[in-house]
Amino acid sequence: RDQLLHAAVPGLTIGMMLHGAEKILDELRAATSRGAHPDRIKELVDRLYRAMRPVTNLLKNPNPGKTSAGILIKEAIFSAEIRLKRHHITLINGMDKDCPDFKVQGSKQMLVASLTNLIDNSIHWLETKDPKQKYLYIGTTEDIEGGAAIIVGDNGPGFGKDDPEDLIAPFFTRRAGGMGLGLYIVNEVMRVSQGRIVFPNKGDVDLPDQIKGAVVALQFLET
């Protein structure tokens, strides 16, 4: 089973990318049906192109390369922007608040897909809890021992008493209709990127006051 899951990770990662593109396509169809302004149609077509380009890039060149945390965050925010607005979620971008940038070694496409998956999880659980004001935070930290990390957090229900080992186990999910593979795939992507997925406790990292729910860190280990 483990061998099959490892072999499936690239394909499942592409599936996560296509999920983001599908949301843009839905918005594009809705815009055309209501006769939206041509500039809006053009904007959505451009977004769809940018969402699909990483898929073709991954298929052409799956090998790891060099990028930065800031670029990964920018790309992930771009792919999730429409969904965040649709669900009335306020984005707090730590990179606008002097969070440190750092170099990253790995597959840019897979890492962006991993971040997008974390954002998608936050959107889902924020809708489930439905607080009066919904917040999503994405930034970086050097507070976790072992290496710099990208942080995604929200003010949803959090992970409760779930064990971190269970959260990254394949087929473990509390999401109705979920496959239980999202965090497993993210963990595998981090493993091959010389990193790991971490679930910081309250007080482990510096976060905006609004972020009181789930917090996930993608840590790139120092070598």
Predicted regions mapped to residue ranges:
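Short helix-loop "hinge" at the ATP-lid/N-box region of the Bergerat-fold HATPase_c
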Residues: 121-126
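Short conserved segment of the HATPase_c
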Residues: 159-171
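Detector for a conserved hydrophobic position within an alpha-helical segment of the HATPase_c
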Residues: 190-191
